[in-house]
UniProtKB/Swiss-Prot annotation:
PANTHER family: UPF0102 PROTEIN YRAN. Disulfide bonds: none annotated. This is UPF0102 protein Bamb_0202. GO terms for molecular function: nucleic acid binding. It comes from the Bacteria. NCBIfam families: PRK12497.1-3, YraN family protein. Belongs to the UPF0102 family. InterPro entries: Restrct_endonuc-II-like, tRNA_endonuc-like_dom_sf, UPF0102_YraN-like. Residues 1-23 are annotated as: Disordered.
């Protein structure tokens, strides 16, 4: 389904310093929405076009769906952690989460983007920095 050439990670700034993470009971939808908005703005400044946000499909939710100038659909998982303890934000996208993302993306792709190339990226906010992981995983890896 999704095959795009891997690219090097890109970094930026954008997270307040602190400890712990933003997920679970301590987190909130508004905190998640803030990070998703910041990720969207970061990606738009790098030439990606916004397609959709918080799309619930059979199998899971897609935080952001973007499109590259060449038409590739990019399914973006946004993660935030105050520190890199416990593996950090990017490491929190485990195989179960990847499997749910691929399932949801497949349903979206069939309805809205069939025929387009696609990839899975992660935008991770941690320890005061933003890291963009292009082609973070492949559909056939899960």
């Amino acid at each position: 389904m999704c095959h795009a050439a891997p690219a090097a990670p890109a970094s930026g700034r954008g997270l307040p310093h602190g400890g712990g993470n933003f997920s679970g009971a301590a987190g909130s939808r508004s905190v998640g929405a803030t990070f998703e908005q910041r990720a969207r703005q970061f990606l738009e400044r790098r030439g990606l076009a916004f397609v959709a946000a918080n799309v619930t499909m059979r199998g899971g939710e897609l935080d952001l769906v973007m499109r590259t100038p060449d038409g590739t659909l990019v399914f973006v998982e946004v993660r935030a952690r105050r520190s890199t303890r416990h593996g950090g934000a990017a490491a929190s996208v485990g195989w179960r989460k990847r499997r749910r993302l691929v399932k949801a993306a497949l349903h979206f792709w069939v309805r809205h983007g069939k025929g387009a190339a696609c990839r899975f990226d992660v935008v991770a906010f941690e320890a005061g920095r933003l890291e963009w992981l292009h082609d973070a995983f492949r559909a056939d890896d899960v």
